[in-house]
């Protein structure tokens, strides 16, 4: 995401130091957002969509992708039996 269109800061844990500092920055600046709970599907979504989505769209799609990537494989396999 180009700085002219916005900045997305990703942090690992909500409430951790990186998240808290990023949030303070985002609250003071225009077109800066922070998401936490980063996982690999979220990063892949970010890299593939950062040139085609607005900052708000990117935040929403990254969060949705991260949540969709959380699974319990054993439960899924047991349900398929």
Which residue ranges define each predicted feature?
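N-terminal loops that bind phosphate or other acidic moieties
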Residues: 1-81
């Amino acid at each position: 995401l180009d700085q002219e269109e916005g900045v997305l800061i990703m942090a690992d844990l909500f409430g951790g130091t990186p998240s808290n500092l990023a949030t303070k920055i985002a609250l003071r600046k225009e077109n800066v957002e922070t998401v936490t709970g980063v996982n690999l599907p979220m990063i892949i979504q970010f890299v593939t969509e950062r040139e085609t989505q607005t900052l708000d769209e990117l935040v929403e799609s990254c969060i949705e992708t991260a949540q969709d990537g959380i699974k319990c494989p054993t439960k899924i396999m047991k349900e398929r039996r």
